[in-house]
């Protein structure tokens, strides 16, 4: 596949942004892993592993007796993942270059799976979920973080440039065959694949400028605006304004983050 097929790109700036994003969300991710029962000796599939920030966390959790199968179609991201694993001394990660729609992952070998902000982008999310269900052992658990209402992302009061960027995000994802609010369909799809819903949690935050989580959408706007210009959605001048919109908000400003659903299901 071409690295250009990624709506958000696979360049160094995107790797850096994904690292920041993972650091912001890491406490909630680790809590989800704990509640899903992921522990030493487990076999876990990371579906759409990207540069491997969650995969390396999982590898440390499951330990030498466990295994992490990191599935990712971008060779660029896998190179970053493998280098990170070497640097951390983690020999229990198998990094596999694979389109998570086109090929299955294996049958009945995984104690758990992890998937974050992937289903919004893939051509056939139902098929991907079928692969997840097939890979799990009986009793295995699937953990997902997916958007359920992207339009909750608002500044207080609303900022026209943030609103404009949000609409462009939805358009670019839609044009590439994706759906922003894929989390709304997720519980029904999992049930149809024979999985039992264990827990659904809403993950949404109201933060002030200067809060660590503020950096998550701010960094997305900075890199995403440039990517939109590269793809021809905006002119360079508008991209520059959109990139710094959250940085230019007054001190003490408030923001609501996009609504993410955490779904844990059991086979």
Per-range role (PLM):
Residues 143-211:
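Conserved catalytic/acceptor-binding region of the Class I
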Residues 45-47, 51-103:
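Class I SAM-dependent methyltransferase SAM/SAH-binding core
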Residues 104-112:
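A short acidic, Gly/Pro-enriched loop at the edge of an enzyme's catalytic core
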Residues 126-141:
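A short glycine-rich, Lys/Arg-flanked "PGG" loop and its adjoining helix->strand segment in the class I
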Residues 111-126:
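A short SAM/SAH-binding and catalytic strip from SAM-dependent methyltransferases
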